[in-house]
Amino acid sequence: MSNCAVTLRALQTGDMPFIEQLYATSRAQEMAHSGWPAEQVAAFLSMQFNAQHTYYQAHFARAEFLIIEHQGLRIGRLYRHFGETCALLIDIALIPAFQKRGIGSALLEDLQRQADERELPIELSVEPYNPALQLYQRFGFKVINQAGVYLRMRREAPNHPRRMAQ
């Protein structure tokens, strides 16, 4: 469990510059190898962020788009959706200073608890080189297929007595 207490709140219009910078930070290592000038990298990442944000809003309209805060400071984002047949972890990202402090694990534990209460499996997509892949595997997620550059992972809901009786 995290020794860093966090709170979640709904994404607001004023958070857009923060989540765009968070997105750029999450791709900094990848972009360092591009050989592009800084201005080109910034323009590319801005375009990619806008495309991702538009896609998420259109395809996950009923999702919870949350800002992760610690002592009033924005430190990340968590996008999740609880559907009728499955919970989705759409995106989770933390600023580097708050990574590897147990926050991601605590948020996954909370997601699992909520999904388990609803008897829902959880699905997510992750790139194979993303360090979070190991975290997801520790939490019982298994690769179910590969779509493009992403691994699709799933964690089954635990068996409940009601389900076992059927």
PLM region descriptions:
Residues 5-7:
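Extreme N-terminal starter segment of soluble prokaryotic enzymes
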Residues 56, 136, 141:
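Conserved active-site tyrosine of GNAT-family acetyltransferases
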Residues 100-113, 134-138:
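Conserved acetyl-CoA-binding loop-helix of GNAT-fold acetyltransferases
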Residues 13-14, 21-90, 95-96, 108-110, ...:
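Acetyl-CoA-dependent GNAT
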Residues 115-127:
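Conserved GNAT acetyl-CoA-binding A-motif
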Residues 9-11, 125:
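Surface-exposed loop and edge beta-strand positions of immunoglobulin-like domains
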Residues 95-101, 128:
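Active-site acidic-Proline motif in GNAT/NAT acetyltransferases
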